From Swiss-Prot:
It is found in: Nucleus, Nucleolus; Cytoplasm. Keywords: ATP-binding, Cell cycle, Cell division, Cytoplasm, Differentiation, Magnesium, Metal-binding, Nucleotide-binding, Nucleus. Residues 27-279 form the Protein kinase domain. One of its GO terms (molecular function) is ATP binding. This is Inactive serine/threonine-protein kinase PLK5. It comes from Mus musculus (Mouse).
Amino acid sequence: MEPRSRRRRSRQLVATFLRDPGSGRVYRRGKLIGKGAFSRCYKLTDMSTSAVFALKVVPRGGAGRLRLRGKVEREIALHSRLRHRNIVAFHAHFADRDHVYMVLEYCSRQSLAHVLKVRRTLTEPEVRYYLRGLVSGLRYLHQQRIVHRDLKPSNFFLNKNMEVKIGDLGLAARVGPAGRCHRVLCGTPNFQAPEVVSRNGHSCKSDIWALGCIMYTVLTGTPPFAAAPLSEMYQNIRDGHYLEPTHLSPSARSLIARLLAPDPAERPSLDHLLQDDFFSQGFTPERLPPHSCHSPPVFAFPPPLGRLFRKVGQLLLTQCRPPCPFTSKEASGPGEEGTEPDHMEAGNEERDPLCTEGRIHLLTLGTPRTGLAGPKGSLALQLEVATRKLFLCLDAGPMAGQDPPGEQRPVLWAPKWVDYSLKYGFGYQLSDGGSGVLFRDGSHMALRPQGGHVSYQPDQGTLWTFTLRDVPSPLRAKLAVLRLFACYMQRRLREEGTVPMPATPASPDISLLSFIADSQAMVMLFSNGTVQVSLKTSQTQLVLSGEDEDLLLTLQEPGGPAVGVSYTLDVLRSHGFTLAVHHHLRHGLHLLQSV
C-alpha cells in the first residue's frame, strides 16, 4: 500500500505553468484557494492576457478512479453548457497524464462559508439578497433539467462585486422523464432532503429543501439538522423535526418551515418563493458592501435624489381599481420590517374617513421650513440634530437599577409602519391618526386627521396641501399607495387593540425625513425634530422630542401605558436610567454615526 505521505505529495504535484493543448494558451498556477474531497482549486493567470481565473484540478489515473473519471466527464458536459450570471462561469478544460483541469470564473470574495466562518450569522436583508441570486441561478439550472444535489454555503461563491454564484457541479445530474435522478444517497448529509435520505431519488424540490437548510444556517449559525449519530439526524430529516429559531422574524420562520416541508409537494416553487412575505415585507439591498464579508452592514435609507416614480405610477394608474376599502394579509409594525399589503380589493369592512372617495381641491401652497427641502445638507443636518439629542440623554445621568419616576404625556410617534421601500416607499402611521409615505423618489405625501387633508412635498420642492375632493392626475398613483398603507395600518391597529392615545395633532408639514435600520433596530427621523428608536426584538420604542433643555425621552413598551412614560432631562440627571435604555440609546447612536 502506498504510504500516506507519498500520496499527499503526489496530489500536490501540479505544474506551475500549464498549457492548454487545444487553444495553445499558457497559464501560471497560483496559490491554493480551496479544496474538496476529490479536487483542489488554485488561482490561475493567463500569461498572454493577465486575466485571472480559478483552476479546478481533479487527479486522474488508477483503477479506483474510473468512477471519479465518469463524474468529472459528466460535470464538464453539464457545466460547460451553462451561461448565467449567478452560476460560476466555465471557460475551458483540458487534461494531461495526471490531472483534469477546469478553467472557471474567479470569485475573489471566496465562498459564503468563508463569510459565515467570520460572521457566524447574517442579517435578514443580507439573506434576502443572497437568496434572490441563488433562486435566479437555481431556476436556470432547473430549466435546463439539472438538479445540483449539493447546495450548501461552501458551494456559493462571491465575486468582487459581491454577486453570488452557484458552483461545484460535481454531483449535478439531469433529471429523468419523471423529474427524478437515480436513487442514490449523495450530497452533504446536513442538507439532504427526506426523499434523498429515504433513497427515493433527487428532484428539483430536493434543491429547494437545501435552500431551506441554507436559509436556516446563515440566519442562526448552525444547520437545522446536525444531530449525532447520523441515524438520528436522518430520522429528524424524514420527520422535518428541527429546533425552531424563535429569535427570527415571523416571516423568516414561516418561509423556513415551508422550505423544510417533509412532503416535496408542499414546498414552494422557486417563483412562489420570491413572492413569500419574507421577501415582500422587508428591505432587500440592491448590492452588499465588501466589508459585509467580515462585519455586519448597516443599511441606511436616505431619500434618494433624482429618482422618478415611473413604475409605481404606471402600475397603479393603469391596473388598480378604486383603492378603498382594503383588505390585508398580516400586521406590520414594531419588531417587524413591514408586511406587504394585499392588492386593492373591495370588502365589507367598516369604511374609514381616511378611505372615503371624493374630489380634492388645492387648499394652500407654501414653502416648508428652511433646510427640510435642501438638496444635500438636509439629511446631514437632521443626523447631527438627532445625534446631539441622543448624546444629551446618554450624558444626562448615572445608571439606575430601576426606571426613574416618569409622567404620562401624549407625544407624537409612529406606532405602525410598512416597509415596502423596494417597490413603493416606507409607510407609517402617527399616534395622532395621521399617516404618511416616504416614496422612493424622495417625495413625501401625508394624510392629516384634521378634515382629511392631504399634504404633498416633492423632493427639494414646495409643500402642497389638498382636501379630499380633487387631486391632480399625476399624484393619483402616490395617493393610492398612501391610502392603501393608511387603511392597512389603521385596520391592523384596531384588530390588535393597540390604538395609541391621541397625541397633539401634528402640523401639516410634518414628514419622515429618513430611516436607518440594521438587523436589531430602526431609527426614524421626522421633520419636527422627533427621533424614534425602535427595537425589533423587544418591540420597545424610544421617542426623543423637544429641544435642548426641553428634551423629553418617552418609553413605549408592550403592555405599558398606551401613552407611554416620559422623562425630562432633569429627571434623568437626578435618577439616571436603566442599562437596557442605555443600551438602546447607544444602538441608535451607532446607527446614526454609521451613515
